[in-house]
Amino acid sequence: MAEQESLEFGKADFVLMDTVSMPEFMANLRLRFEKGRIYTFIGEVVVSVNPYKLLNIYGRDTIEQYKGRELYERPPHLFAIADAAYKAMKRRSKDTCIVISGESGAGKTEASKYIMQYIAAITNPSQRAEVERVKNMLLKSNCVLEAFGNAKTNRNDNSSRFGKYMDINFDFKGDPIGGHINNYLLEKSRVIVQQPGERSFHSFYQLLQGGSEQMLRSLHLQKSLSSYNYIHVGAQLKSSINDAAEFRVVADAMKVIGFKPEEIQTVYKILAAILHLGNLKFVVDGDTPLIENGKVVSIIAELLSTKTDMVEKALLYRTVATGRDIIDKQHTEQEASYGRDAFAKAIYERLFCWIVTRINDIIEVKNYDTTIHGKNTVIGVLDIYGFEIFDNNSFEQFCINYCNEKLQQLFIQLVLKQEQEEYQREGIPWKHIDYFNNQIIVDLVEQQHKGIIAILDDACMNVGKVTDEMFLEALNSKLGKHAHFSSRKLCASDKILEFDRDFRIRHYAGDVVYSVIGFIDKNKDTLFQDFKRLMYNSSNPVLKNMWPEGKLSITEVTKRPLTAATLFKNSMIALVDNLASKEPYYVRCIKPNDKKSPQIFDDERCRHQVEYLGLLENVRVRRAGFAFRQTYEKFLHRYKMISEFTWPNHDLPSDKEAVKKLIERCGFQDDVAYGKTKIFIRTPRTLFTLEELRAQMLIRIVLFLQKVWRGTLARMRYKRTKAALTIIRYYRRYKVKSYIHEVARRFHGVKTMRDYGKHVKWPSPPKVLRRFEEALQTIFNRWRASQLIKSIPASDLPQVRAKVAAVEMLKGQRADLGLQRAWEGNYLASKPDTPQTSGTFVPVANELKRKDKYMNVLFSCHVRKVNRFSKVEDRAIFVTDRHLYKMDPTKQYKVMKTIPLYNLTGLSVSNGKDQLVVFHTKDNKDLIVCLFSKQPTHESRIGELVGVLVNHFKSEKRHLQVNVTNPVQCSLHGKKCTVSVETRLNQPQPDFTKNRSGFILSVPGN
């Protein structure tokens, strides 16, 4: 369990108070405010007191403390209510909403921003790029809407002057995928006039203070706020908002959201055009109205991308259609000023609505298919203007306070009235708790035919000139007996009210005196059609799209539009219906004082808000009531896995009996009540424990399902693999048979062919038979060789084998192997080769045979050798099957050196036509010689020497390494050296010479 607050901070939940009374409630609220604890629970309702200072309780660490936690686990916080709404939406796939209410300056807008920040922070753990993009745009939209819809008032430096309801759409995983914003009743009159101590919308000041010099020049603006009539009232006011810095923030946010550069530029042009409109002055020359500063008209025309004469005409004249006739009616100075102001208000309102629509176009959910992506759920966040009581309350305050009456009625219906009625319907023992039901005030305003809005609409539709005083008279006549309505005519002794001007409504939040001045005009919301046509004909496509009705013909008769009050009433009814369809969570904001001080807690001011918000009644209902209720069927569907009596299905008489069994199994029977169709759970702790038990069981269920599914998958994979292996086996057998049949077909009758099938092409074998094919080809080649050998005399076979060995070792590396001649081998005994000494050699050879017991002579030949001392001499070599003898032919073939063949490790020859050969020995005493023949001269015998030696070594199952290089590497008594071969003209015979790296064998050139 997470750490809870100590008692020094008071009660974290008003439900835990010892006695439910206003003094104790206020004492606890004050204590927590003074201790810096601005949030307190009433069950699942959060009471928030505006601290009027920045608190370090909204960072990432705090977010992590509340993420996934239940309400009772952490101290009260906005994050707790946001997480509760998110979990309810995700767990039960149910739409939820967070309703933030309270009077102006109580901190509603900041609360909505922190809630949005929290939801953005806890979603999209997998960091999907598209979800991050949506989250970023949802957050950035806040500062854009604040810039164009918020203003400094006497009660709040960042007061929302419009209502905002945002739906955030989530996919089945709980990640935001889009959203939609509804805006309500922008206070557009603030564009042209503000009360003392207040400012117009932030956007004007941000543009003038944050725009670059170049930008302001292009818009024909200057930084001086007092230069513009529409905003000069608040020019000298100090604000906690840094307009220049906010301008850059808003500009960046618009880019991030997806506004195009030309769209952003159009926004600045519209703001500049409004400021210039306010500086227009009208004079009358006789009966003709004129614009005193005509240059400003040209600037406005340039900014609005239209023609100067068209702007001037729309400001000074009104086009009237009477039947088929069209006339231009001149304005009086007063009418021209009225038209100018109406135009400025309308432009700004259209701009604001266009910004909202543009944001919606970008953030709305696109291409979402519930069959593929699962159910799309919603969390709604309502941030709407709070209850307002000013020194001068007009039509805007009337609408705003009506909105708050509707929201209070929703709270009463859902939290107080419906809850008590449900207990009675379900047969739950209950003691009724009294509360003030403000439905009577809601009806006073919105009732059909009898309410104030209906009376106002009737007055606006009357033929002839209707004044605000006539409207007040109609109110007195029709509502004179209403308990919550009064005026000076109805109560002559009440001197607070002015005759023919004021009326009072007793709102749930207190009495408010309204001045009827401007009610008729603001309700009609009149804007001459000339201005609409002017804007529709703009060459700027953004402006053109803002005024679609401007395309109507002058003579076209249109239906009377709904009045501003009726439009607002309809939007409020739709909003309340929307909120009622969702599971609501409430944040009740309280303003501690009127001085915006973080140190002052005004008891009377706060008590009044606690009373009209019905917070004490909320505590009583909460203490006596139940935190959660659910139908037996749905409850069982969610929690049946907790008990063995209900999992997977129960066999009890009814769902109610099954739920009872489940609750008793968990030991919660003292904390629940059983209604006719629903179970009621008193404390959140029980519900949270049920959720924990369910989460634990879900892990086991998921593991079981995973085990079963893995087994199923394994069996399926085994069957598929077994089938595949069977197919592979039969296919391989088929390929093998096909290959063997094809080989048999192609090589059929090769024995009768002249070349024994040498030209027959082998078929391509399957992969599995590649090694078999190699073996088969080897067998075939041996058979073919045996067939060829049969025709060779037995005496020639050793020579053939030697030639084959030579080819294997030297083919492709030496040009001439001597294959075309007969290989005699023992050339020293041959008279043609050594006619004078052959007779001398034979006795020596016989003596060596007797002495060394050799069986066969492999090779003998005259050579020229070089030793380590660079001495070059003519010698002879005599190779038997046991030894290599170096002999001196000048001394009757005396044996100079004997090398056993087992001591021979390899041969090295060059890659040319020379006869160089190096015999490598184990003791690194290599023998370097160059073969030569006397008859015929320059006969190549290297191939023969290599062939007979390799063939002999092979017969003894030994390997003789043969190297073909140039230069040739050798070792003379352990000293490494090289022998390179050079061809020289006029060289009579091969000869060795010394060089730096070893020796050079010079051979005769052609």
Swiss-Prot record:
* TH1 domain boundaries: 812-1005
Pull one GO CC term from this UniProt entry: myelin sheath
Disulfide-linked positions? none
Q: What is its main location?
A: cytoplasm
Q: Which residues carry this modification: Phosphoserine?
A: 200
**Which superkingdom does the taxonomy of this entry point to?**
Eukaryota
Q: Which CDD domains match?
A: MYSc_Myo1
Where N-acetylalanine occurs, the residues are 2
What's a single GO BP term from this record?
cellular localization
Q: Does the keyword Transcription apply?
A: no
The record describes its quaternary structure and partners as: Interacts (via the two IQ motifs) with calmodulin. Binds an additional calmodulin chain via a third, C-terminal region. Interacts with F-actin.
Described function: Unconventional myosin that functions as actin-based motor protein with ATPase activity. Plays a role in endosomal protein trafficking, and especially in the transfer of cargo proteins from early to recycling endosomes. Required for normal planar cell polarity in ciliated tracheal cells, for normal rotational polarity of cilia, and for coordinated, unidirectional ciliary movement in the trachea. Required for normal, polarized cilia organization in brain ependymal epithelial cells.
> What's this protein's family per the entry?
Belongs to the TRAFAC class myosin-kinesin ATPase superfamily. Myosin family.
What is the name of this protein?
Answer: Unconventional myosin-Id
Give the source species.
Homo sapiens
Lineage here is: Eukaryota, Metazoa, Chordata, Craniata, Vertebrata
